[in-house]
């Protein structure tokens, strides 16, 4: 049976199904409803409101170190408050899965700025996952947990206002109970003193290389990254809600590379896709996060000169600015 749910409601369901045991959050639109929808799952998930985003981040990280799968949520400006522990966790790694939701707000519907928090993933050198609809909001939580544990990394789970609040049909799965790994005292890993941080940094860089390879292989197999080949004339690289807009607007025969793992970018997959199309567009909201890196790799593409770097996109804007219709 399928259920009509918002992205936030579906994310809460994903937390339950992924076997996450601890969720801490600080309220703020567009993220608030995630934690609000968790108490219905009873004692399977311990959930709490924290006094601020930094505390929420630290509570969840403590649960991760102890071995539980852990989750915390906040709106995008809240990650400014939580940046200190997040960056340090990037160097220390995890025990149980550790997933941090940043709910971005293009067009400033309820926020004091329009910051693009994808840059936090690059700065903190951690993995980033972006769902594009309610079903993916649920499904990608489990994949984010698997990535976190396999690669010993926090995962930034980036949504946007439209992904959070738009509704779609969601097919449920069963909860998978996660067997918590035993906590082992490890001062080298979990005490990020300067000497330990110095030794951990090479491990972080190696982790990014492995994550990029994962994005080109396993992430395609499990549906996190999707390649949809058309007639080869036009190709679109996109992610998050922008995929929905582009999919509706571009004509039949258009090829799509839809990325769910958006940091690190799977550059070999992108090169292979670009080689199969005559003209390449990058469609994304706010900053040219993907576009800049793709162009830096020597891949010719068109993006922000058409779509701009402010405010939300929608089908009408993409149709007018990109296709000139």
Give the positions of each predicted feature:
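Thiamine diphosphate
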Residues: 1-134, 162, 291, 296-325
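Flexible, low-complexity linker and terminal segments
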Residues: 1-8, 131-325
């Amino acid at each position: 049976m399928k259920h009509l749910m918002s992205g936030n409601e579906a994310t809460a369901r994903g937390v339950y199904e992924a076997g996450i045991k601890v969720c801490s959050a600080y309220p703020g639109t567009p993220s608030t409803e995630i934690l609000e929808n968790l108490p219905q799952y009873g004692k399977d998930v311990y959930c709490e409101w924290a006094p601020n985003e930094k505390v929420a981040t630290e509570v969840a990280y403590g649960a991760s170190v102890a071995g539980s799968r852990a989750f915390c949520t906040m709106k995008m400006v809240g990650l400014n408050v939580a940046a200190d522990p997040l960056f340090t966790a990037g160097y220390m790694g995890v025990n149980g899965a550790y997933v941090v939701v940043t709910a971005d707000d293009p067009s400033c519907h309820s926020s004091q700025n329009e910051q693009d928090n994808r840059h936090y993933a690059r700065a903190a050198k951690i993995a980033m996952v972006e769902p594009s609809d309610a079903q993916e909001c649920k499904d990608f939580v489990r994949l984010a947990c698997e990535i976190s544990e396999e690669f010993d990394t926090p995962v930034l789970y980036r949504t946007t206002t439209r992904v959070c609040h738009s509704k779609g049909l969601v097919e449920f799965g069963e909860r998978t109970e996660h067997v918590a790994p035993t906590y082992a005292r490890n001062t080298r890993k979990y005490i990020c003193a300067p000497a330990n941080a110095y030794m951990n940094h090479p491990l972080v860089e190696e982790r990014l290389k492995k994550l990029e390879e994962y994005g080109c292989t396993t992430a395609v197999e499990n549906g996190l990254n999707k390649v949809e080949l058309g007639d080869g004339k036009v190709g679109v690289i996109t992610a998050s809600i922008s995929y929905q807009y582009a999919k509706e607007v571009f004509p039949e025969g258009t090829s799509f590379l839809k990325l769910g793992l958006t940091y690190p970018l799977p550059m070999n997959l992108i090169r292979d896709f670009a080689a199969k199309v005559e003209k390449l567009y990058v469609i994304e909201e706010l900053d040219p996060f993907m576009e800049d890196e793709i162009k830096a790799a020597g891949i010719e593409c068109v993006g922000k000169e058409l779509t701009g770097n402010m405010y939300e996109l929608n089908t009408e804007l993409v149709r007018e600015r990109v296709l000139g219709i």
